[in-house]
C-alpha cells in the first residue's frame, strides 16, 4: 500500500525560512515534521522544537546531525547556504533520500555537482518557491519574445539587509530566462555594475540592480524600456509564507510522484 503521510526534515530549522516551514508543516494535513536540524554550535540542540518556535505541540528534539536522523524522514527541505546544502545533499544521495533545495548562491561547479547527484536521488531546486514569481517568469518569456529586441531590459531586485548573495538567485534566473528566449549568451549580456564603465548602454545587455535594506521580503521588477514607453512587470512578496507554502507543495509533489532521481524545478510542479 502506498504511503499517504509525508515526513519532512528541515535543515536550517531555526532560520527565518525554517520557522516558516515548520509553521506551514504544522498546518498541512498528512505532512509531519520529524527532524529539525540546526548548525553544530546551536544552543538549542536537544530542546523541543515546538516550545522554541512557539508554533504548537511538536515533540521533536532539535538536532545538529542529519546522519543520525536519516531514517526519520522521507524528504529533506534545505534553506541554508551552499556549503551546508552540498554536504547534506551528499548524505541524502548515499541514503537515497530526496531533497528540496531553496538555497541560492551556488557557483557553476557547485551547480554541476547538484546535477550529477540528481542521477542518484530526486531533487527539486528553485531560487524562489513563490507561485507568483514563477508565473511572472512565464509571463516574461512571452513579453521578451514580443518586445525584447526593441527595448532595453533592466532587472531590479530588493531584499532584507541580512541576505548575503547579490544579485538574488531569482533575478539571475529571470535574466537567464530572458537570454535563453533571445538566444543571448547570459555570461556576456549580464551587467552587474556601471560605476566605472564611463560609456553609454550597449545593445542587448541586461542590467542588474540590487537593494539590501530593512526587512524587505523580496521584490523583483523587470523593466522593458524604449524611447516611447516603459513596461514594468513586478512581483512583491508580502510574507515568507509564500515561499514555505511553495516548498511544501514541491515536497508533496516529489513525494507523490515517487521519483527515484531527477532534477526538477517549480515549472514541473506548476506545469507551466
Swiss-Prot record:
E.C. no: 1.17.1.8
Active site residues according to the UniProt entry: 159, 163
Keyword Iron-sulfur attributed: no
Pfam families documented for this protein: DapB_C (PF05173), DapB_N (PF01113)
Gene Ontology molecular functions: 4-hydroxy-tetrahydrodipicolinate reductase; NAD binding; NADP binding; oxidoreductase activity, acting on CH or CH2 groups, NAD or NADP as acceptor
Keywords: Amino-acid biosynthesis, Cytoplasm, Diaminopimelate biosynthesis, Lysine biosynthesis, NAD, NADP, Oxidoreductase
Location(s), subcellular: Cytoplasm
A Gene Ontology term for the protein's cellular component: cytosol
UniProt binding sites for (S)-2,3,4,5-tetrahydrodipicolinate: 160, 169-170
Organism domain of life: Bacteria
Any single biological process term in GO: diaminopimelate biosynthetic process
Subunit-level organization: Homotetramer.
UniProt-listed NCBIfam families: dapB
Reported function: Catalyzes the conversion of 4-hydroxy-tetrahydrodipicolinate (HTPA) to tetrahydrodipicolinate.
Similarity comment: Belongs to the DapB family.
PANTHER family linked: 4-HYDROXY-TETRAHYDRODIPICOLINATE REDUCTASE 1, CHLOROPLASTIC-RELATED, DIHYDRODIPICOLINATE REDUCTASE
Cross-referenced HAMAP family: DapB (MF_00102)
Protein name (Swiss-Prot/TrEMBL): 4-hydroxy-tetrahydrodipicolinate reductase
Amino acid at each position: 500500500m502506498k504511503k499517504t503521510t509525508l515526513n519532512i526534515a528541515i535543515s536550517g530549522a531555526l532560520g527565518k525560512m525554517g520557522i516558516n516551514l515548520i509553521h506551514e508543516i504544522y498546518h498541512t494535513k498528512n505532512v509531519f515534521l520529524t527532524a529539525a536540524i540546526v548548525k553544530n554550535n546551536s544552543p538549542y540542540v536537544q530542546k523541543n522544537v515546538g516550545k522554541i518556535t512557539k508554533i504548537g505541540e511538536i515533540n521533536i528534539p532539535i538536532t545538529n546531525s542529519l546522519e543520525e536522523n536519516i531514517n526519520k524522514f522521507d524528504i529533506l527541505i534545505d534553506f541554508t547556504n551552499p556549503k551546508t546544502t552540498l554536504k547534506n545533499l551528499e548524505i541524502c544521495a548515499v541514503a537515497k533520500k530526496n531533497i528540496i533545495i531553496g538555497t541560492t548562491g551556488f557557483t557553476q561547479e557547485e551547480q554541476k555537482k547538484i546535477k550529477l547527484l540528481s542521477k542518484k536521488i530526486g531533487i527539486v531546486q528553485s531560487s524562489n518557491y513563490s507561485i507568483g514569481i514563477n508565473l511572472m517568469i512565464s509571463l516574461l518569456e512571452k513579453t521578451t519574445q514580443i518586445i525584447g529586441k526593441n527595448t532595453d531590459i533592466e532587472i531590479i531586485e530588493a531584499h532584507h539587509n541580512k541576505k548575503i548573495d547579490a544579485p538574488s538567485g531569482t533575478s539571475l534566473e529571470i535574466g537567464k530566462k530572458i537570454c535563453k528566449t533571445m538566444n543571448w549568451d547570459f555570461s556576456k549580456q549580464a551587467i552587474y555594475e556601471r560605476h566605472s564603465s564611463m560609456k553609454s548602454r550597449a545593445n542587448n545587455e541586461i542590467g542588474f540592480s540590487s537593494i539590501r535594506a530593512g526587512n524587505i521580503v523580496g521584490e523583483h521588477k523587470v523593466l522593458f524600456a524604449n524611447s516611447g514607453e516603459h513596461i514594468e512587470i513586478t512581483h512583491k512578496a508580502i510574507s515568507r509564507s509564500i515561499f514555505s507554502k511553495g516548498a511544501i507543495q514541491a515536497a508533496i509533489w516529489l513525494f507523490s510522484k515517487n521519483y527515484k532521481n531527477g532534477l526538477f524545478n517549480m515549472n514541473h510542479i506548476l506545469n507551466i
